[in-house]
Amino acid sequence: MGLEKSFILFSLLVLVLGWVQPSLGRKPSVQDFKRQHMDPGSPPNSRPTICNQMMKRRGITKDSCKPVNTFLHESGQRVQAICSQRQMTCKTSSRKNCHKSSSTLHITDCNLKGSSKYPNCDYTTTNRQKHIIIACEGNPLVPVHYDASV
């Protein structure tokens, strides 16, 4: 009987690890970057609820309230071109694969309000024109992580 229980527990463990493992070591991808940050062709919207709508529509608040997110209102080509700028150390980590835009871009910063609790994620919306810093990987280099605005 003990051996049977051990086998069942082992089988469940293998099944759970099969579900969890792919996301553990998963590297950021250009698809994730696009889903979380790109909003080309859309001018910055001054509606105070636009962040709430975009975060939900893009599935960014599917499992929890993300504290901060930034949407880029520029063409994919313009953002991709940032990867050809001089390489630098990222602002939010010690990674050295970041690049800073040479000009300002239209962005929308979404910041979680302090009183907000999942699943009712509530964000403040701030439209800006700032330089951005992104991490790029691959050959050719493509954006995979939004690092900061400066």
Swiss-Prot record:
Catalytic residues, chain numbering: H37 (proton acceptor), H145 (proton donor)
Alphabetized CDD domains for the sequence: RNase_A_canonical (cd06265)
Signal peptide positions on this chain: 1-25
Transmembrane regions: none
Keyword Protein biosynthesis: no
This protein's UniProt keywords: Disulfide bond, Endonuclease, Hydrolase, Lyase, Nuclease, Secreted, Signal
Disulfide cross-links: C51-C110, C65-C121, C83-C136, C90-C98
SUPFAM superfamilies per the UniProt record, alphabetical: RNase A-like
Enzyme class name: lyase
Catalyses which reaction(s): an [RNA] containing cytidine + H2O = an [RNA]-3'-cytidine-3'-phosphate + a 5'-hydroxy-ribonucleotide-3'-[RNA]; an [RNA] containing uridine + H2O = an [RNA]-3'-uridine-3'-phosphate + a 5'-hydroxy-ribonucleotide-3'-[RNA]
GO MF assignments: lyase activity; nucleic acid binding; ribonuclease A activity
One GO cellular component, as annotated: extracellular region
Pfam families for the chain: RnaseA (PF00074)
A biological-process GO annotation: defense response to Gram-positive bacterium
Residues where substrate binds: R35, K66, P67, V68, N69, T70, K91
Compartments, record wording: Secreted
EC number: 4.6.1.18
Function (record text): Endonuclease that catalyzes the cleavage of RNA on the 3' side of pyrimidine nucleotides. Acts on single-stranded and double-stranded RNA.
Family membership noted in the UniProt record: Belongs to the pancreatic ribonuclease family.
Subunit note: Monomer.
Protein name, UniProt field: Ribonuclease pancreatic delta-type
